[in-house]
């Protein structure tokens, strides 16, 4: 036992010594600020924009080894004024120390604090990011470099948690005369591993034109892979409403959707009133589809309906919509192979009740 403790203590002492040595040697032999000019030149070359780095790029050594920068600012596209396209108060990447000894890069934390992103479309319909997108699309992909022996490989790269604080995203559409802003966005996640669950926390305030802002907060256990997405222990709060439950999407090419959700209360009229106040549709200026002419049959999107694969339950404890109030609404949806069953559904309405089921069969040529 004493021998084991001695070995453990010696190992910790060696690791601590290596960390202290790195903290002393790295700033002496490598100053990232020497590359400020090169970074600014590359950004100008690749994007056509001017990058400012007002604060020094520095090292961090505790509790993780990392590099940090602050006072970042990227200029706007020509014709969109002096307001910066993006600015960041502080940003950094921290890596785990031990994996570096075996040539692996394990990112512990990526953080972004005080992001301000200004997206805009002018009266002519041109936006302020398409010039960057055009340059990226026209760039030729370099030949893959051959891996050198003993050189750390990005193949072992692992990304840890993401930490975004005090972010603001502003959208201004001069062609439609509308504005949209996501304010005080806070996002934190667990470690990113494809197919493995991670904790997700998201909060923000949404403001559109002159309408009252909407506050939202989300907590969930997220599992994502290239072909599936699952939200477990979902807890979403929007103003005075709270949605809980779970949902899952499998096979993005031909989605299979499963959900089990419960909403405590919602006042739909509150949001409809806000839409009337702004005089604009909730989608941010999109034109609504023309209404069907009375007496004429509505053409159903049969191919889309036949491909539906949905199974889920949705419960609403209290709801107000179009001046009507309902309680304990239970809604079920089951769609598979062209047979769509909406129900059995039920709800309490003004001392009475509703119970019913609707089935749509689109397996044949004529819907039934």
Please report, for each region that a protein language model flagged, where it lies by residue.
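Short beta-strand micro-motifs enriched in acidic
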Residues: 60-62, 96-100, 120, 190-192, ...
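Secondary-structure transition motifs
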Residues: 49, 64, 71-189, 250-307
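Amphipathic hydrophobic-ligand
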Residues: 48-52, 78-95, 107, 175-188, ...
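N-terminal type II signal-anchor transmembrane helix
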Residues: 1-48
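Solvent-exposed beta-strand/coil patches in large extracellular/periplasmic or lumenal scaffold regions
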Residues: 131-175, 201-205, 228-234, 282-368
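Short extracytoplasmic
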Residues: 44-71
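Transmembrane beta-strands of outer-membrane beta-barrel pores
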Residues: 114, 206-208, 238, 251, ...
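Contiguous, well-ordered beta-strand patches that form the walls/edges
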Residues: 201-225, 229
């Amino acid at each position: 036992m004493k021998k084991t403790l001695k070995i453990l203590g010696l190992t910790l002492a060696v690791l601590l010594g290596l960390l202290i040595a790195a903290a002393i040697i790295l700033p002496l032999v490598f100053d990232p600020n020497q590359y400020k000019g090169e970074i600014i030149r590359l950004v100008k070359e690749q994007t056509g924009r001017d990058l400012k780095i007002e604060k020094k790029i520095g090292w961090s050594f505790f509790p993780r080894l990392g590099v940090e920068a602050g006072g970042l600012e990227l200029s706007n596209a020509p014709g969109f004024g002096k307001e910066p396209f993006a600015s960041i108060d502080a940003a950094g990447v921290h890596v785990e120390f031990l994996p570096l000894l075996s040539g692996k890069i394990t990112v512990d934390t990526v953080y972004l604090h005080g992001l301000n992103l200004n997206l805009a479309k002018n009266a002519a319909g041109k936006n302020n990011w398409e010039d960057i997108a055009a340059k990226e699309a026209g760039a030729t992909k370099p030949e893959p470099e051959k891996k050198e022996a003993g050189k750390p490989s990005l193949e072992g790269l692992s990304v840890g948690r993401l930490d975004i604080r005090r972010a603001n995203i502003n959208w201004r559409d001069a062609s439609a005369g509308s504005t949209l802003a996501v304010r005080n966005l806070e996002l934190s996640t667990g470690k990113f591993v494809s197919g493995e669950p991670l904790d997700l926390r998201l909060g923000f305030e949404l403001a559109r034109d002159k309408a009252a802002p909407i506050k939202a907060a989300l907590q969930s256990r997220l599992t994502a892979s290239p072909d599936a997405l699952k939200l477990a222990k979902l807890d979403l709060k929007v103003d005075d409403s709270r949605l809980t439950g779970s949902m899952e999407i499998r096979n993005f090419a031909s989605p299979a959707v499963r959900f089990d959700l419960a909403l405590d209360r919602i006042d739909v009229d509150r949001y409809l009133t806000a839409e009337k106040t702004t005089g604009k549709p909730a989608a941010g200026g999109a034109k609504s589809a023309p209404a069907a002419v009375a007496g004429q049959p509505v053409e159903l999107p049969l191919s889309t309906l036949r491909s539906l694969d949905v199974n889920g339950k949705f419960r609403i404890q209290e709801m107000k919509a179009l001046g009507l109030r309902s309680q304990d609404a239970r809604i079920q949806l089951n769609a598979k192979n062209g047979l769509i069953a909406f129900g059995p559904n039920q709800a309490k309405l003004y001392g009475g009740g509703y119970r019913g089921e609707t089935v749509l069969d689109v397996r044949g040529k004529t819907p039934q």
